[in-house]
């Protein structure tokens, strides 16, 4: 596998791997790489990993591999959007940027769930009024199991057992080798930080310049991650409400009183729509509180605060959820059943279920305490994995990457998804970890408009120069 020859072809900015005429390629080329389905059986079944390369605008330092997170998001797509304002011109000039779809994802050998619905039949995201937790949990779990069966039926045999991060990290080393690189230069966002530090743990001698932005803490359980995300979402909502009431989110703010009053208005809106779904401009379309919650959680970064205000204003003042409906539809279209299944499959490989009905109900109650607005949405990872299965390749909790080159960990103080303290913890756990901080309200930092962050990350990736110890970037 390490010695295979890669056949590149022009593919252009098509959003995928489609072949184009050479003159239309816009510096993009694509290829497929073969890897074993099971690294313990290298002579057995093989799968394909999709690569998309954007050639450097100037003299190339080599290959920079990128991962957008998810888990389950497409690096093939990221490599195009990265050249549209996310990555700096200096970085694009200095590296051939390589996007890849991890195993199970997108244009690689992917999980296929046939015609399964976007939610996999899992039902409501939390117990409904008058419903016991156990009754809801049983219905939810049955939906997850049905989704798993649908995906197992339509996917490559054995694929669901071999999509974990350990296997993807081994794939990444094959990709490094076939690109002719002695070491892996890598930029990973969110879940992509987990792929990065797993690679560094497995292949410290092959680890080059690595940036992990929006870090996961490898020592945490699935339950601890859920609770951390719930609390992070709640804190981010409070920051949004404060900015909204201060007139910093565009249109007139529909949230009155103090911050706690505004937060309560959002909670009341969600609860009311769960009891009686809110109407829209389309007579046959209504929006539930669960859908509103999902849209709000997806808009808690500063770059999307104006969109959030635009959705909340007609819903609160006129009882019109049309903007929420549009956003919810877009989220459903961008996250079909296969994408959701891929996220579940990777998550459950990495952190198999450890709980039972009692522990899940306790977690539900604890999540409600740390996040009265969103807690219910962050209570079911372990329960999901119990219903899904396939937890045969758990990640190690003790990650040090001993012997690896310096690794730059980037944390955002107001990150609603990957908590800042997780970045602190990862930088501390890694033998060669160094922390870079952005004082901002966003999920991940690089490419969010901070010249301080961009300059520090670029200097490290292009020149190998680490920022000064504990550098904090503002604005």
PLM segments and residue spans:
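Short helix-capping/linker segments at secondary-structure and domain boundaries
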Residues: 298-318, 353-358
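Gly/Pro-rich cap/lid or specificity-loop segments adjacent to the active site
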Residues: 1-291, 345-475
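Long, low-complexity segments enriched in small/aliphatic residues
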Residues: 322-351, 355-360
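Short loop/turn hinge sites at secondary-structure boundaries
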Residues: 135, 276, 303, 311-322, ...
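Structural motif
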Residues: 276-293, 301-304, 333-341
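Flexible "cap/lid" loop of the alpha/beta hydrolase fold
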Residues: 216-234, 309-314, 320-333
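Short alpha-helical scaffolding segments that buttress acidic/His motifs in well-ordered protein cores
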Residues: 291-297, 312, 345
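N-terminal, charged low-complexity regulatory/assembly segments
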Residues: 243, 294, 306-307
């Amino acid at each position: 596998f390490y010695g295979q020859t890669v056949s590149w072809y022009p593919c252009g900015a098509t959003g995928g791997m489609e072949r184009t005429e050479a003159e239309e390629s816009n510096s993009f080329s694509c290829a497929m790489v073969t890897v074993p389905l099971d690294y313990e059986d290298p002579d057995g079944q093989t799968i394909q990993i999709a690569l998309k390369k954007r050639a450097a605008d100037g003299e190339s330092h080599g290959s920079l591999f990128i991962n957008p997170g998810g888990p389950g998001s497409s690096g093939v797509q990221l490599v195009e959007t990265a050249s549209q304002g996310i990555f700096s011109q200096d970085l694009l000039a200095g590296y051939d940027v390589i996007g890849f779809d991890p195993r199970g994802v997108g244009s690689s050998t992917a999980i296929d769930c046939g015609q399964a619905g976007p939610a996999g039949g899992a039902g409501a995201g939390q117990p409904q009024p008058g419903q016991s937790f156990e009754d809801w949990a049983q219905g939810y779990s049955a939906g997850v199991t049905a989704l798993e069966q649908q995906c197992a039926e339509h996917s490559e045999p054995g694929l669901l057992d071999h999509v974990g991060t350990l296997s993807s990290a081994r794939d990444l080393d094959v990709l490094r080798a076939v690109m002719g690189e002695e070491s892996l230069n890598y930029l990973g966002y969110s879940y992509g930080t987990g792929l990065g530090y797993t690679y560094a743990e497995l292949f410290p001698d092959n680890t080059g310049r690595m940036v992990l932005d929006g870090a996961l803490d490898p020592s945490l359980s699935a339950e601890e991650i859920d609770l951390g995300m719930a609390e992070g979402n709640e804190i981010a909502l409070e920051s949004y409400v404060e900015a909204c009431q201060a007139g910093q989110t565009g249109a007139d703010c529909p949230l009155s009183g103090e911050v706690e009053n505004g937060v309560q208005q959002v909670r009341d809106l969600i609860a009311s729509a769960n009891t009686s779904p809110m109407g829209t401009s389309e007579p046959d379309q209504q929006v539930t509180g669960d859908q509103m919650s999902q849209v709000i959680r997806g808009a808690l970064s500063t770059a999307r605060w104006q969109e959030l205000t635009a959705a909340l204003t007609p819903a609160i003042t006129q009882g019109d959820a049309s903007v929420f409906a549009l956003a919810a539809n877009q989220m459903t279209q961008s996250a079909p059943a296969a994408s959701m299944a891929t996220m579940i499959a990777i998550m459950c490989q990495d952190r198999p279920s450890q709980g039972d009905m009692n522990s899940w109900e306790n977690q539900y109650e604890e999540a409600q305490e740390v996040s009265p607005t969103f807690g219910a949405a962050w209570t079911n990872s372990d329960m999901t994995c119990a219903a899904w299965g396939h937890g045969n390749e758990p990640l190690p909790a003790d990650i040090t990457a001993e012997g690896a080159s310096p690794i730059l960990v980037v944390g955002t103080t107001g990150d609603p998804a990957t908590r800042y303290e997780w970045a602190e913890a990862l930088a501390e756990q890694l033998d060669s970890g160094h922390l870079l901080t952005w004082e901002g309200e966003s999920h991940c930092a690089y490419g969010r408009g901070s010249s301080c962050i961009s300059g520090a990350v670029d200097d490290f990736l292009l020149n190998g120069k680490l920022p000064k110890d504990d550098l904090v970037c503002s604005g």
